[in-house]
Amino acid sequence: MRPAHAEPSRSCRRRTAGPADHDLRGRCLHERWRTGGIQERAAHGHARDRCAGTIDRPLLVYLFDPYCPWSYGYLPALTHLLDAVRDEADVEVVTIGLHDGTRIDQAPAPMRAVQRATGVGFGPGYRRALAEGEMQLRSRDAAAAVIGMTAADPGRVPDVLWAVHRAFFWAGRSLSDGATVAQTAQRLGLDGAAIEVFASSSRAAQMAEEDFHLARDLGARRGPTLLVSHGDRLCELEGPGTSGQHLVEQFRGVLARP
């Protein structure tokens, strides 16, 4: 059995119709159902336009956790891929729910291993928070923030992921803190106050739980997983340690298969 953050198997499987099928489109994942206005969602507690999208394009599904150091390390390669295929594929981010109140000193990042494999660095704020050991990691709160930011600007998924990861792994800020969420959103040019309100709502918590359930159905592990849904195939691309160009080549290979 390979380690949680080792190179994925790059496996592909055919999806057949049936009650147990991981049919992403059937679960409205592919149709960008999170594109309702943040302020309206915060006020009314529901998502709009759940099924308004393009179903003929391949779908990249990224399973990750904002508090996962290997997800942070995967970002350079993932960003390269998303930039390269932005006109060819839709993208959906699904959070996996890694932590539920874990203290930061009980989940220290393997900083040397991540930096050696991926090149990302860890900032003084994160190191200080780790040394203090008091922060509690609640993935549900972090997921709600990600959902709010990606819904506010669906075309900037890489920017949102970088901003959220760096808020924690560089600045050492808690993603359960409303001020952190608002400031992170504002730096992206988004309405920080509205996103803070949404992220603290019961609807955001419900949507985060929906993510966690979907991630489990899709076989999420404790590290990042990148899937391509194309036709009747669901394929896994390589994980942390690979290059962005290699991900592009793998993606094109999936599309080229009969």
Where are these regions (language model features)?
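Active-site donor-binding loop signature of nucleotide-sugar glycosyltransferases
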Residues: P3, I96, G239
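Short cysteine clusters
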Residues: A4, C68-S71
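Extreme N-terminal starter segment of soluble prokaryotic enzymes
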Residues: D56-L60
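Structural alpha/beta surface segment adjacent to cysteine/selenocysteine redox centers
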Residues: Y72-F169
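Secretory/periplasmic and organellar redox-cofactor proteins
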Residues: L29, R34-G53, A205, F212, ...
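Short, well-ordered coil/turn elements that cap or connect secondary structure elements
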Residues: P3, I55, R86-E88
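Rieske [2Fe-2S] iron-sulfur-binding domain
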Residues: M1-E40
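C-terminal cap of thioredoxin/glutaredoxin-like
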Residues: F64-Y67, L75-D83, A163-P258
